[in-house]
Amino acid sequence: MVLELDFIFHKDKLFTVTFRYNNCKKRSQEVIKMIEVRNLGHKYNSFTALDNVSFSFSKGVFGLLGPNGAGKTTFMRILATLLSPTSGDILIDGKPLSKEATFIRSNIGYLPQHFHVYPQLTAIEFLDYIAVMKGLTNKKIRHEKIMHVLKEVNLHQKAQEKIKTYSNGMKQRVGIAQALIGNPSLLIFDEPTVGLDPEERLRFRNIISKISDEKCVLLSTHVVTDIESSCRDLIVLNKGKKVFTGTVEDLKEVARCRVWEVPVRTTSETSDYIVLQIKESNGQLFAHLLADEKPYPYAKAIDPTLEMGYMALLEEIR
């Protein structure tokens, strides 16, 4: 049986990929356990997007941080088999990605950064289409799975409405739902909480927390608190290079004894230092400054957050 699948996105548009499900039917029940990235590189003409990157991750939620242009999306597109690396390889349970493309595609849930839908379809119609393309041929089972993921993302009461009537946040939740359809063992989320309000962002965190024991989840986001609350391990990329791998606590330690809280009385007090955060308490403004030594006699050292550790790391390598 050959099915034409056009649910994968490339350059913000849909394109068709042909999967031969008969070739991987038995393997579709296999679970991806380990992903190893070995000396991965990719160039767009003369621009190096990834430069000799190596790391590994397994079941659980693995965080991917980095500023714009760091190479995060390029890596995720390579892992999703949408892009071939210029050098190096990715091993899926010890086997080269280039030889496992069909298996990966039948076991992946992918939410790209720029997710598009068919606006004339309802959420149920769109997800039914995706489910069929992912090989769910039993109509009853398909409907049950669709309603399950719609409840997970809190769209079940809007399931019969056309997607064109949805807000941007609701469309993003449709994107999360389509990634979850088919019970994939590898999930790739590129900026999944963009456009979500705080309640829905918390709901997303709960979703991936529930499934993280069974699946490999790669989470890339600029919302550092999402990484802090969901991940144990992470990697930081900058200008295509790996600049950090370790635990969330390890990255926090980069800023240990380097973040100071001072009351803001004049702008000159903070002008010579990197300001990580401004907060208000009892009508008084306080600044969190990054400094290797105590900047003022009245400065107080505070415990760093992940965002503080991340900013301190980027400042070190600037």
Please place each PLM-identified region on the residue numbering.
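Catalytic Walker B motif of ABC-type/P-loop ATPase nucleotide-binding domains
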Residues: L187-E191, L196
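Conserved ABC ATPase "signature" region
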Residues: D128, V132-G135, K140-K158
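ABC transporter nucleotide-binding domain
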Residues: F204-H288
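Conserved ABC transporter NBD signature motif
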Residues: G88-K99, F103-I104
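Walker A (P-loop) phosphate-binding loop of ABC-type ATPase nucleotide-binding domains
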Residues: P67-G71
